[in-house]
């Protein structure tokens, strides 16, 4: 006796279910391939404790690194309220307390589970270098206070230290070249090392020091000015030097102190300041000038007296006064020498000028790569404006307003006569605050170097299918389910009959 139509349908559905189910298993098990899951994101925190203020930066990078160095990007920046940590000599604990608000903001961004593995570092620069020279005990107390605050936070605290000027310059060089894609760039779906080309030099003007860093055309003859790096599998040799006491704030204080000493010797009162606008007048405490080891005093000078200063708005004499703060004669006749007897190869390639280089020229609207003649003309004309006109023209900017003339002329003296840029090489300088969305400074370069010391995590392997195989598997799974449900329905109706 043959099978009934119900039996034939039932058997057919079971056959379809078995065939499609077997096909689905083959697709899942046999056609699967090994794939890498996206790497976990790691975070790092760096405090830049400068002479005038402190900033916090949060960086992030994939856990699996490219050629032993993390592919780092900036995730957060936070400027801490108050002065630089070197100002807290009378109450060092406040230096640590000042960091808390920005640290809390950083921890809110980073997943809580990753707080204990987030490397955190505080680097102090020229302000603390000067304090260490003046009073090493006070400098140690401040570093101890900030270390205590950060070590109590839930992060992996790597330490707080005074950064050497050479490191500050070299890490700034790394930052610029990394952000501009000179060290590593993304192309055709992967990170690759770019061909050897035009690496960019770094010009940094802080409050207490200035740094120049670049790769010269020839060999670096003075090994004390050479720093070597290995980043993303490539080696780099960079010339770098830091000039302490030649930062913006210190040079302006040194200039005022020199004018005050000259006034004392000539018995002329008040001090006539050629870099201040005509009509400007102020009474300044003389003692504040001599807090820094950058300024050498004379026994005959009474530090308790006040100083009356009058501006004359004379850019020519301002340049003469600024030049007197350099020792150019020590490099006379030497091709590879900047000033103060310091070795420097001839500048080569493109340069990014940042920090106070940028802030000063941004105020003067000189960041659009104007010619040297235009820059000179603009700065001189600004210096010759009467103080009352300057005040009216720039409301709400009183804090730094009197100093932009001196700062602009100082930058020209430093770059042209100090670092030996010329009218031909001037167009190679770009005045920038950021490259892309990243602030230019030493902190990113430090974090890139630091990630070379942080162990990489092995990428996680999973079994997966291509999209077409996955789609086919879903179709056969649905077909199997429909066949089984159909067979079950037939069985139920069959039993009822």
Curated annotation (Swiss-Prot):
GO terms for biological process: nucleoside diphosphate biosynthetic process; nucleoside monophosphate biosynthetic process. Expressed in liver, jejunum and kidney. Keywords: ATP-binding, Calcium, Cell membrane, Disulfide bond, Glycoprotein, Hydrolase, Magnesium, Membrane, Metal-binding, Nucleotide-binding, Transmembrane, Transmembrane helix. It catalyses: a ribonucleoside 5'-triphosphate + 2 H2O = a ribonucleoside 5'-phosphate + 2 phosphate + 2 H(+). It is found in: Cell membrane. GO terms for molecular function: apyrase activity; ATP binding; metal ion binding; nucleoside diphosphate phosphatase activity; ribonucleoside triphosphate phosphatase activity. Its EC number is 3.6.1.5. InterPro entries: GDA1_CD39_NTPase. Residues 30-473 are extracellular. Its cofactor is Ca(2+); Mg(2+). This is Ectonucleoside triphosphate diphosphohydrolase 8.
């Amino acid at each position: 006796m043959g099978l009934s139509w119900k039996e034939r349908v039932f058997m057919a559905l079971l056959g379809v279910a078995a065939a499609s189910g077997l096909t689905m298993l083959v697709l899942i098990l046999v056609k699967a391939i090994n794939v890498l899951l996206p790497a976990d994101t790691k975070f790092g925190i760096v405090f830049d404790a400068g002479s005038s203020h402190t900033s916090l930066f949060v960086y992030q990078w994939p856990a699996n690194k490219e050629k032993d160095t993390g592919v780092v990007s900036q995730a957060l920046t936070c400027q801490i309220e108050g002065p630089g940590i070197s100002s807290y000599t009378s109450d060092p604990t406040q230096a640590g307390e000042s960091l808390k608000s920005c640290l809390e903001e950083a921890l809110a961004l980073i997943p809580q589970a990753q707080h204990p593995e987030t490397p955190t570092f505080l680097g102090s620069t020229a302000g603390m270098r000067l304090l260490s020279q003046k009073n090493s005990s006070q400098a140690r107390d401040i570093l101890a206070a900030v270390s205590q605050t950060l070590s109590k936070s839930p992060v992996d605290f790597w330490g707080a230290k005074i950064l050497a000027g050479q490191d500050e310059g070299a890490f700034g060089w790394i930052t610029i070249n990394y952000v501009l894609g000179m060290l590593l760039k993304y192309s055709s779906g992967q990170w690759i090392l770019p061909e050897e080309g035009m690496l960019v030099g770094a010009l940094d003007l802080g409050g207490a020091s200035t740094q120049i860093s670049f790769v010269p055309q020839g060999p670096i003859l003075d090994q004390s000015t050479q720093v070597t790096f290995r980043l993303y599998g490539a080696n780099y040799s960079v010339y770098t030097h830091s000039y302490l006491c030649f930062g913006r704030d210190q040079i302006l204080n040194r200039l005022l102190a020199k004018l005050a000493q000259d006034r004392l010797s000539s018995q002329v009162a008040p001090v006539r300041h050629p870099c201040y606008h005509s009509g400007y007048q102020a009474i300044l405490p003389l003692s504040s000038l001599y807090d820094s080891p950058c300024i050498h005093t004379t026994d005959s000078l009474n530090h308790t007296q006040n100083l009356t200063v009058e501006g004359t708005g004379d850019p020519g004499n301002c340049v003469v006064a600024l030049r007197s703060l350099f020792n150019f004669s020590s490099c006379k006749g030497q091709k590879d020498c900047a000033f103060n007897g310091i070795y420097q190869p001839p500048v080569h390639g493109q340069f990014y000028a940042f920090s106070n280089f940028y802030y000063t020229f941004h105020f003067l609207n000189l960041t659009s790569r104007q010619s040297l003649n235009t820059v000179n003309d603009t700065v001189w004309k600004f210096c010759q404006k009467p103080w009352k006109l300057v005040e009216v023209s720039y409301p709400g900017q009183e804090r730094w307003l009197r100093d932009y003339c001196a700062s602009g002329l100082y930058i020209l003296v430093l770059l042209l006569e100090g670092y030996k840029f010329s009218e031909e090489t001037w167009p190679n300088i770009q005045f920038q605050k950021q490259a892309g969305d990243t602030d230019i400074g030493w902190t990113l370069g430090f974090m890139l170097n630091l990630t070379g010391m942080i162990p990489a995590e092995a990428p996680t392997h999973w079994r997966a299918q291509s999209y077409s195989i996955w789609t086919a598997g879903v179709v056969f799974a649905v077909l199997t389910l429909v066949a089984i449900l159909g067979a079950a329905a037939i069985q139920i109706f069959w039993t009822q009959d």
